[in-house]
Amino acid sequence: MKNTPTQLEPNVPVTRSHSMGFVILISCAAGLGGLLYGYDTAVISGAIGFLKDLYSLSPFMEGLVISSIMIGGVVGVGISGFLSDRFGRRKILMTAALLFAISAIVSALSQDVSTLIIARIIGGLGIGMGSSLSVTYITEAAPPAIRGSLSSLYQLFTILGISATYFINLAVQRSGTYEWGVHTGWRWMLAYGMVPSVIFFLVLLVVPESPRWLAKAGKTNEALKILTRINGETVAKEELKNIENSLKIEQMGSLSQLFKPGLRKALVIGILLALFNQVIGMNAITYYGPEIFKMMGFGQNAGFVTTCIVGVVEVIFTVIAVLLIDKVGRKKLMSIGSAFMAIFMILIGTSFYFELTSGIMMIVLILGFVAAFCVSVGPITWIMISEIFPNHLRARAAGIATIFLWGANWAIGQFVPMMIDSFGLAYTFWIFAVINILCFLFVVTICPETKNKSLEEIEKLWIK
């Protein structure tokens, strides 16, 4: 392909607008990986009610159908760092898209719950690989001043995928009788997963490899071409020097460095960010939204419609986060967001306890929690996990943190039905409230601020 960005001459003058357009292009391309994550996160919320009736699922099996994709996700994240360091970020992202496409086809055609679970594990493998590498790719290409906003594109595309899928679920649910939904409708919900996977794969065909990975692989000229297109020739040469200096450190180190004083703190922060992102309650609403709304007294159709409203709020406040992250800062947004999330969870649990769930106020409380999450912990977790680790350990270290993220994701998907069945909705949401309070304390006391810092400057926070 003669016109791909990787084939630009390094001595071509680069304007700020031209450079910015290129940066946004490659960031959006990688961010599309979030569509896969978002689609699968939301699609199962529409399908699970039909699957429960079709296969007479117990709370444990209901959780397993939902959480099975996280099993593959843990494996995918675990191997993504090694594979991407060896073969490049772009090739592994393309592999992730293919795995998800296979999963969508097999899931839609499955004739028993075992096949469905296996198919979802395959899809999880692809999503796990993509979830850590998409943000890593953007982080390694973006200029420091706008890196946070561009890295949050992954979360934005995730939310767009979630929101669009809620509307797809609603459209499918309205396409036939409930009986049709039990036997056929859920298959269409899962089959449409082919669309984001194909889009992701095709877009990756026309974007370049990560300049930092190219420099690491000894392809200095190619790395300089891409950096020149991003920053202009003068800045590109300086950036390349910084990359090469950090890569020299890699030759003297190993993954064991992460467990030494200094970097060990970075690893702990990355892991805790990942855990809090998953266990503060957002995924419970995402995975079980229609079912929770039915428990509040909503009918089948009303539950799907209300979930669509949740999706719209997610999109709006994620866009707001993209605009604020590099202006307000990561730490401030997360501290404010986690405080509000704790308040909303306390009020939601109290409403369930006193059975005050039939009015508009309950929906407002849930939407308030969703908004607080999407403007803070939701997008910032992915950004900071990709920022806080040294260049020579970033992919593998981010992979470790994301393994914990997917492990926590699995636990929520698996055990929330059992928690609701055993404790009821009130105590379940109060548990999430306590976790949000812990998240607030963690952000305020431990998390660093990385706004407007280069990756090399962030590395110096740990290596003193």
From Swiss-Prot:
Disulfide bonds: none annotated. InterPro entries: MFS_dom, MFS_sugar_transport-like, MFS_Sugar_Transporter, MFS_trans_sf, Sugar/inositol_transpt, Sugar_transporter_CS, XylE-like. It is found in: Cell membrane. The keyword tRNA-binding does not apply. Disruption phenotype: Deletion of the gene does not affect growth on glucose, but the mutant cannot grow in the presence of arabinose. Deletion has a negative effect on the ability of the mutant to grow on alpha-1,5-arabinobiose. AraE/araN double mutant is unable to grow in the presence of alpha-1,5-arabinobiose. Belongs to the major facilitator superfamily. Sugar transporter (TC 2.A.1.1) family. This is Arabinose-proton symporter. It comes from Bacillus subtilis (strain 168). The gene is araE.
